[in-house]
Design a protein with these regions (language model features):
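Conserved segment of winged-helix/HTH DNA-binding domains
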Residues: 75-99
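Alpha-helical residues within the helix-turn-helix
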Residues: 43, 60-61
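Amphipathic, soluble alpha-helical interaction motifs
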Residues: 15, 62, 93-96
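Base-recognition residues in the alpha-helical recognition helix of bacterial helix-turn-helix
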Residues: 29, 54-57
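N-terminal helix-turn-helix DNA-binding core of bacterial DNA-binding proteins
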Residues: 2, 7-50, 70-83
Length: 99
């Protein structure tokens, strides 16, 4: 039982590490409202295309987002909407701590 819990926490830690970057949080916040092109995400984040692509690749590798191509444009969408619930909880914790 302890090993199962330890394994679960290790997986959770890896996923949280994937979320632990301001640019990735911005990307996920935008994708929570629907699909978006890489170009639009680049403008939102304010980084170069290769940096945004690396952020998206990490999120894709963790099963949080997926992509699709339409011609030369790549679009991303959130496939783990529960991550938004985590943001709500984390924001609430920050509000409570600031009181």
């Amino acid at each position: 039982m302890a090993m199962d819990k330890r394994h679960s926490f290790a997986k959770l830690a890896r996923m949280l590490k994937a979320l632990a970057h301001e640019s990735r949080l911005l990307i996920l916040d935008r994708l929570s409202r629907g699909e978006c092109s890489v170009g639009d995400l680049r403008e939102l984040v304010g980084s170069d295309l290769s940096t945004v692509s690396k952020h998206l690749a990490l999120l894709r590798a963790h099963g949080i987002v997926e992509d699709r191509r339409e011609g030369t444009t790549v679009y991303y969408r959130l496939i783990t909407p529960g991550v938004c619930n985590f943001f709500t909880c984390a924001t609430q914790v920050l509000k409570e701590r600031s009181r």
